[in-house]
């Protein structure tokens, strides 16, 4: 009997371990919302005093926002809409692009808009969450008020400084620390529910709807703050591949949702009894002796939440690079065992300067909270639209049935988006500017590479025609030299520019010549047996193809070993890799505005060398340059 139950016990332990890990990574962001969400929701209605019904209505809005948007949309539905186990906007986009018929451009812009909004979120979340936690020091002693921003800056600078070292050593503590945070939140909320048991009326959605109807315009403004309760919900979907659906769902229903609900109920009951606590209900719920430990624990929780968002930005950027939305960047692995732990120095630096700018410009979590909701609501609307396409294309639902399921969610999210748009003049323009910048960058790169490909195709020589001409015996034939040459190309049907330049300038042709194309699949990973393929074109020329998933490291040197196992004979350390380096020159007839030409060329010049990106042996790489008018 014990032998039969052993696998079940092992599976249970694994589920619990994964669920604990997801508490630290997936739910870190949404778990810090109680620090400021209820406080910010109270501000628009607190000028003339807040009635008991208004407080109950606010808490009801928060609980039902968590129920409808997070529980129903993300936890129960979207976690099933995966791309071979991976979630997130770009993963969903990659899946849909495979079967899109005639409206790929719309899907592309929706996808990059969602990705760009997430980058804005990745800048605002660390600044807002760390500031909101450190501000608790003002309640410990007012003498520390002037030190809130400097302390937050030091914490954030340290967080970005350690990214290059990796988080493998400390990440095992993220889950337990965040679990303690949720337990403490739930406990302190539960203790204060007894302050006014009428807060249980918040479970009745009537009070949420009545609040909106009675408050009118102010109610719409309040919705922008209420939405802060669900910020971080996108992380559930984006981190699907790291933990899996069941652990994320299990953690939500057993720990996170109950703790958040208890805390918001407790804050509501506490303010019902103590109206003067509206200035900071979360920290004021703690007794004086527990305030400093609560601030320290909150700071630790916000650091973990910030780390999760930064890691998410790294992962999303890698996906965008592999899908051809961004130029190649340096990607370093910070763990030998966890392939998902990566470090992108360019992205880290960009996020650091962005976060620092937000901290110094806004100076407080109250000011920064007004800028927060737009990026998150925008990303959620994008995800809902992509989910509609997923239901139609992948699950083969009729359009009317898919619309019937998602339209209520879409309408609700549009209401939240409209409420957040009212805050544009108070700082809401910041995430819009950040997102617009990255949309332009990704659109320019995608558009520029397409134009460049079209232009080079017109002047390229078909590969098979070239092989026939070069292998004819004539006095102009290049000198045959021993050894192997691998020529990288993005178009296997055309002759690589590096091969043409090698013959033109060096007048030599190697005994073995491999034309290598590197493909990125629309799936997260490519099975080992489908990684490589080869086709012999002639005695001296072979066409090779290496395929990677958009979540994989594109280590070409490692993949070439699979060719040798399949029978192709060559020694990688005696093989020369020939790469073409293009010097791009703008052209008035490029098809893009002049400013976009310049931006595309700047992006191309900033891209990391292919030899570094594809992990080629640097002492075996030969680069041959050419001018290309774009």
From Swiss-Prot:
Protein name in UniProt: Probable potassium transport system protein Kup 1
Molecular function (Gene Ontology), one example: symporter activity
Membrane topology (UniProt): Multi-pass membrane protein
Catalytic reaction equation(s): K(+)(in) + H(+)(in) = K(+)(out) + H(+)(out)
Domain of life: Bacteria
Keywords: Cell inner membrane, Cell membrane, Ion transport, Membrane, Potassium, Potassium transport, Symport, Transmembrane, Transmembrane helix, Transport
Matches recorded under InterPro entries: K+_transporter, K_trans_C, K_trans_N, Kup
Transmembrane segments annotated in the record for this chain: 15-35, 58-78, 104-124, 142-162, 173-193, 208-228, 252-272, 290-310, 342-362, 368-388, 399-419, 424-444
Compartments in which it is found: Cell inner membrane
Function field: Transport of potassium into the cell. Likely operates as a K(+):H(+) symporter.
UniProt entry tagged with the keyword DNA-binding: no
Similarity comment: family membership: Belongs to the HAK/KUP transporter (TC 2.A.72) family.
Keyword Cell inner membrane appears in the UniProt entry: yes
Species in which this protein is naturally found: Sinorhizobium medicae (strain WSM419)
GO cellular component, one term: plasma membrane
């Amino acid at each position: 009997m014990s032998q039969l139950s052993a696998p079940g016990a092992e599976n249970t332990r694994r589920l619990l371990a994964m669920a604990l890990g997801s508490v630290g990574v997936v739910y870190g962001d949404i778990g810090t919302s109680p620090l400021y969400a209820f406080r910010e929701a109270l501000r628009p209605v607190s000028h003339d005093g807040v009635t008991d019904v208004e407080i109950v209505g606010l808490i009801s809005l928060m609980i039902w926002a968590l129920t409808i948007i997070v529980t129903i949309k993300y936890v129960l539905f979207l976690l099933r809409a995966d791309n071979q186990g991976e979630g997130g906007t770009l993963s969903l986009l990659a899946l849909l692009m495979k079967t899109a018929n005639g409206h790929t451009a719309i899907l592309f812009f929706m996808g990059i808009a969602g990705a760009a909004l997430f980058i804005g979120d990745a800048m605002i979340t660390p600044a807002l969450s760390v500031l909101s936690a450190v501000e608790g020091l003002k309640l410990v002693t007012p003498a520390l008020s002037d030190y809130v921003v400097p302390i937050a800056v030091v914490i954030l600078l340290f967080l970005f400084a350690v990214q290059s070292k990796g988080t493998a050593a400390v990440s095992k503590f993220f889950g337990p620390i965040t679990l303690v945070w949720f337990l403490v939140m739930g406990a302190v909320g539960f203790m204060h529910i007894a302050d006014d048991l009428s807060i249980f009326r918040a479970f009745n959605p009537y009070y949420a709807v009545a609040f909106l109807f009675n408050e009118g315009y102010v109610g719409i403004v309040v919705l922008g703050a209420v939405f802060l309760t669900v910020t971080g919900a996108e992380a559930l979907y984006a981190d699907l591949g790291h933990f899996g659906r069941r652990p994320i769902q299990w953690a939500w229903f057993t720990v996170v949702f109950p703790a958040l609900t208890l805390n918001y109920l407790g804050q509501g009951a506490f303010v019902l009894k103590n109206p003067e606590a509206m200035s900071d209900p979360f920290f004021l719920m703690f007794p004086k002796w527990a305030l400093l430990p609560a601030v320290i624990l909150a700071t630790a929780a916000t650091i973990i939440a910030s780390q999760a968002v930064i890691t998410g930005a790294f992962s999303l950027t890698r996906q965008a690079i592999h899908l051809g939305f961004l130029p190649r960047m340096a990607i370093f692995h910070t763990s030998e065992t966890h392939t998902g732990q990566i470090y992108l120095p360019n992205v880290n630096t960009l996020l650091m300067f962005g976060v620092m700018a937000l901290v110094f410009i806004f100076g407080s979590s109250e000011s920064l909270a007004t800028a927060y909701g737009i990026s998150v609501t925008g990303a959620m609307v994008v995800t809902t639209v992509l989910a509609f396409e997923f239901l139609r294309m992948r699950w083969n639902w009729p359009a009317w049935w898919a619309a019937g399921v998602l339209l209520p969610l879409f309408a609700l999210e549009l209401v939240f988006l409209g409420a957040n748009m009212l805050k544009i003049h108070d700082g809401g323009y910041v995430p819009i500017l950040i997102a617009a910048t990255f949309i332009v960058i990704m659109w320019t790169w995608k558009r520029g590479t397409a134009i460049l490909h079209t232009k080079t195709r017109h002047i390229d020589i078909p590969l098979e025609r070239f092989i026939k001409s070069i292998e004819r015996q004539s006095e102009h034939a290049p000198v045959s030299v021993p050894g192997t040459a691998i020529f990288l190309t993005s178009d296997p049907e055309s002759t690589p520019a590096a091969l043409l330049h090698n013959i033109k300038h060096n007048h030599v042709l190697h005994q073995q010549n491999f034309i290598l194309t590197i493909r990125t699949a629309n799936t997260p990973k490519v099975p080992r047996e489908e990684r490589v393929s080869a086709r012999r074109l002639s005695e001296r020329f072979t066409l090779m193809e290496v395929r990677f998933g958009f979540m994989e490291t594109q280590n070409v040197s490692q993949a070439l070993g699979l060719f040798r196992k399949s029978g192709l004979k060559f020694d990688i350390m005696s093989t020369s890799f020939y790469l073409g380096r293009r010097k791009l020159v703008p052209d008035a007839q490029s098809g893009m505005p002049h400013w976009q030409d310049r931006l595309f060329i700047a992006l191309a010049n900033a891209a990391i060398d292919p030899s570094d990106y594809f992990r080629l042996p640097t002492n075996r790489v030969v680069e041959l340059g050419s001018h290309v008018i774009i």
